[in-house]
Amino acid sequence: NLPMDVRFMLPSCVPATPLDEAGAVLDYRAIDPFYEHPRVQGLAEMMNYVGAVAADSQVLEKITAAQAHHKKIDGHAPGLKGMELNAYLAAGVYSDHECYDMEDALNKLRLGQYIMIREGTAARNLDALIPLLTPQYADRCMFCSDDKHPSDLLEKGHIDYHCRRAIAQGVDPIIAVKAATHNAARYYQLNNRGAISPGYLADFAIIDDFDHFHVQMVFKKGKLWYDGQVKPFSAPPIEETLVNRARDTFHLPRLKLE
């Protein structure tokens, strides 16, 4: 009951590769029950594009399970093209965030994928993909960070940084804001969000201008929650055992010089 939305995509590749060691092996049976949770939007980036193209049974089980729940399936297909890209899309992967240049992005757009324009800490693709933010292509584009360090979030911002940087390079502010809000909401089937209109939840922010994107006010479901400071709200108590588990996760024996 906090005044915010936090939504999830279920992991598609744990472990990340067959040779990797992880805390668990998550097949489709392990993740399938979580699709019933109202905050789960779909299956996260299908990194095993080789398995999808090769019709690996475990990969296809995860994809078909997501489809059975009418959920989105995000992609991860750097450089994939031709018949392999066709096969990947035919499996039911709806988006990709691994586009490094316009050629790759246009190949995927023409085949029906949505493009997540990534600007993170390590991978930074926004400048190369700025031409996507035009009326011809923008309706099937949205922003993502993929991986961004906390220090970068504090110093530069998150999706607001995408907007500032895109607008500074000449992108129409309406197109930039739409990629950050409306397009993402439509893609993830959050059909009562992403716009200010009758029938929509009144979730919106008021900024100072399109150059700085300093947030002045934040409304959630029509209620003002921030106007320079966060309004008081009641939060459920956090179990101490959960706090301790989150903090006590890294264990090494005492190191010696030799």
Show which residues each predicted segment covers.
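Divalent-metal coordination cores built from histidine and acidic residues
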Residues: N1-K72, Q136
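Structural preference for beta-strand elements that scaffold enzyme active sites
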Residues: D5-R7, V40-G42, K72-D74, Y94-S95, ...
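Structural recognition of alpha->loop->beta junctions
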Residues: Y28-G42, Y88-N107, A138-M142, V171-D172
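Divalent metal-binding pocket/active-site signature
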Residues: E45-M102, E119, A123
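Histidine/acidic-residue-rich catalytic or RNA/ligand-binding cores of hydrolases
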Residues: A55, G82-L89, L111, N125-A138, ...
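Short acidic/histidine-rich active-site segments
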Residues: H76, H97-E98, M116-A122, Y137-G157
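Active-site microenvironment of metallo-dependent hydrolases
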Residues: L154-G170, I174-E258
